[in-house]
């Protein structure tokens, strides 16, 4: 399986959740894992290098990949598609980034972190609709959305906010799985 962590909104915890999920699969589920940082910021890969300096036995490495060239990105994805195990990819924060279409075309899942503020909701909704337009233009894109609410505390929120959040969740459920 190829799992992308993607959202065009920055600060939603995409890289952090990608790392947590990778740790879970590696440590708890003992899954054969390849982790790739395709985000130009290379935050995940940089953190993992720091980890490897402090620890001897890290359970997995994070490979840095540049996706600026769609042709080479397509070749990388075809290679990944043929591998056993699970590939986790931390993606750039923009669908307009060269190579994103190739990532999406070969993914099984798009894990899309979000949180309940208007800017994030609007940006995440725009991201969903942009991916849906890409799916229409490129039918080979079959990836299923998994939405992960981040920075959510069940003890917080007025009645009106809770109702608004429920509407947001219902909207996201139309397009994928709400985790």
Model regions and ranges:
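Walker A/P-loop phosphate-binding motif and the immediately C-terminal alpha-helix
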Residues: 1-37
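Conserved nucleotide-sensing/catalytic segment adjacent to the nucleotide-binding pocket
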Residues: 55-89
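P-loop NTPase switch/communication element
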Residues: 41-58
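Switch II (G3) loop of P-loop NTPases
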Residues: 39, 80-100
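Short, well-ordered alpha-helices that flank and scaffold nucleotide-derived cofactor binding pockets
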Residues: 19, 23-27, 49-50, 105, ...
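Conserved catalytic-core segment of NTP-binding enzymes
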Residues: 34, 92-178
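Residues in the short beta-alpha loop(s) of Rossmann-like NAD(P)-binding domains
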Residues: 39-41, 151
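Generic beta-sheet signal
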Residues: 1-3, 33, 84-89, 145
């Amino acid at each position: 399986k190829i799992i992308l962590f993607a959202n065009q909104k920055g600060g939603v915890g995409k890289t952090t959740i990608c790392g947590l999920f990778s740790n879970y699969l590696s440590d708890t589920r003992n899954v054969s894992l390849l982790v790739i940082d395709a985000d130009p910021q290379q935050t995940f890969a940089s953190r993992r290098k720091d980890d490897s300096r402090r620890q001897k036995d890290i359970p997995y490495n994070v490979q840095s990949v540049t996706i600026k060239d769609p042709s080479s990105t397509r070749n990388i994805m075809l290679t990944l598609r043929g591998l056993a195990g699970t590939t986790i990819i931390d993606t750039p924060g923009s669908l307009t980034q060269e190579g994103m279409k190739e990532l999406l075309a070969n993914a099984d899942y798009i894990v899309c972190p979000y949180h309940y503020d208007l800017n994030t909701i609007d940006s995440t909704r725009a991201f969903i609709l942009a991916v849906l337009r890409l799916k229409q233009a490129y039918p080979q894109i079959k990836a299923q959305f998994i939405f992960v609410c981040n920075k959510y505390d069940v003890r917080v929120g007025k009645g009106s906010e809770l109702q608004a959040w429920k509407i947001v969740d219902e909207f996201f459920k139309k397009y994928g799985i709400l985790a």
